[in-house]
A protein has these predicted regions:
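Glycine-rich, N-terminal phosphate-binding loop of Rossmann-like dinucleotide-binding domains
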Residues: 105-106
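Dinucleotide-binding Rossmann-like beta1-alpha1 core, especially the glycine-rich loop
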Residues: 1-28, 156, 307, 316
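General small-molecule cofactor/ligand-binding pocket signal
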Residues: 68-70, 209
Length: 411
């Protein structure tokens, strides 16, 4: 299977699939469990260090290309004219009409359909996947490990992430679309499997840096309910003339970040065919260069360590932050002393990246909450520093802080 993967991928990242003997594994991974070790296959893949920022940058690039973006506005229901979908009703009271509506609500696809038509049949199987982040200790692997979990045979992985390890995953049916988090049972399972894979680690609950959970919007098939791991990961784009389709509507079922570009292309092509529109431009980006930041980009007065963090987190988009600093040198200062976030990041996130809450800022823009840093004890100080920079009232600062603490419980 991996050789087929390599052939289809064309080895875009270098390296090649090859087998490793048990002896080689013991030498390369001395902390790896010894019993039952027969060998392994090695392959090369890409890693998105900050998937949250990838999504944000896709959104801002779309806006720069002419799209509209309404943060914090929910589609309450679809508007029907007889049997055809003709528009949407928004949570702020607006009614928007269009010749074609695309329901790309992820794991909320069914909820939107059922709010619009109570008899709508579910199209998704939703499962929860949870992960924990642990410190990567001396002697632990610098490359990812993908094995079968000892307790249940599920796919299980440890993936290096900076100085940490992402450990996952679980696969559990989840029916509540608005609330999800890693349960204690899942955390215990992940800790136990990590310790079995790396027996010398002896990880404890106190070692957990953070948890992450998400909901997979998997396509529901007819027939009896099957085991979570057996549900197909293939996506579907359902148009008006497809089975389960409705006039005026495209439903996106399934999909994930890995395939977001091809899924978007497939959806847009279907929409253009429905609307009778011909493509005038190609979005192929093989020749687009995304230059990395160099020391020549560092504004005068910005600490080199802080510059390097901005370069790592934002890539070429960091130039927008540096432009702000060149206009106002005070934005090069740390937001709070002792944490590597500068004031310019906050201004950039709120003025150019649609950040509206503290959770937006620190979990999906500045990425502070994914760092193994002592920010947990300083949430109030961080909230007040942001409030001062953005001229929040005391009441707004209190409300933002309270909302952030609630959001952190789901991390």
């Amino acid at each position: 299977g991996l050789w087929l993967y390599e052939a289809m991928a064309g080895r875009p990242f270098g390296g090649e699939v090859r087998s490793l003997s048990a002896e080689t594994l013991r030498r390369r991974f001395p902390d790896f469990r010894k019993d039952g070790l027969r060998g392994a296959l090695r392959y090369v893949d890409a890693q998105v260090r900050y998937p949250e920022r990838l999504v944000v940058e896709l959104m801002t690039d779309a806006v720069h290309a002419g799209a509209s973006c309404d943060i914090g506005v929910r589609v309450e229901a679809l508007i029907r004219d007889n049997s055809e979908i003709v528009g949407v009703e928004l949570s702020d009271g607006r009614l928007l009409y269009a010749p074609l509506i695309i329901n790309a609500a992820g794991h909320w696809v069914d909820q939107l359909m059922q709010r619009s038509e109570s008899r709508a049949r579910p199209m998704l199987h939703t499962t929860r996947g949870s992960h924990i982040m642990l410190p990567r200790r001396a002697g632990h692997p610098a490359s990812g490990l993908y094995v079968q979990a000892r307790s249940d045979g599920r796919p299980f992985f440890l993936i290096p992430w900076g100085d940490s390890l992402w450990v996952g995953t679980t696969d559990i049916y989840h029916e509540q679309p608005d609330h999800w988090y890693a349960t204690e049972e899942e955390i215990d399972y992940l800790l136990d499997e990590a310790n079995q894979l790396l027996p010398t680690a002896d990880y404890k609950h106190d070692d957990i840096i953070l948890t992450r959970a998400g909901i997979r919007p998997l396509v529901r098939k007819s027939g009896p309910r099957i085991k979570e791991g057996a549900v197909s990961r293939a996506h579907q784009v359902i148009g008006p003339r497809d089975a389960r389709g409705e006039p005026g509507l495209i439903n996106l079922l399934g999909g994930k970040l890995t395939t977001h570009r091809s899924l978007a292309e497939e959806t847009v092509r279907k929409a253009m065919k429905i609307l009778g529109v011909k493509r005038s431009h190609s979005t192929r980006s093989k020749s687009v260069v995304l230059p990395e930041l160099t020391d020549a980009d560092r504004p005068e007065g910005l600490d080199k360590t802080l510059f390097e963090r901005v370069a790592r987190v934002y890539g070429p988009y960091g130039r927008d932050i540096f432009d702000l600093i060149r206009t106002d040198e005070s934005l090069a200062a740390p937001l709070v002393e002792g944490l590597p976030i500068i004031k310019g990041e906050i201004v950039h996130a709120t003025s150019m990246e649609f950040a509206a809450t503290l959770d937006d800022l620190f979990a999906r823009r500045c990425m502070l909450t994914t760092e193994d840093l002592p920010w947990h004890e300083r949430t109030r100080e961080l909230a007040e520093a942001v409030g001062e920079l953005l001229h929040w009232s005391d009441q707004e600062c209190d409300e933002q802080h309270t909302t952030w603490l609630k959001a952190l419980k789901q991390h």
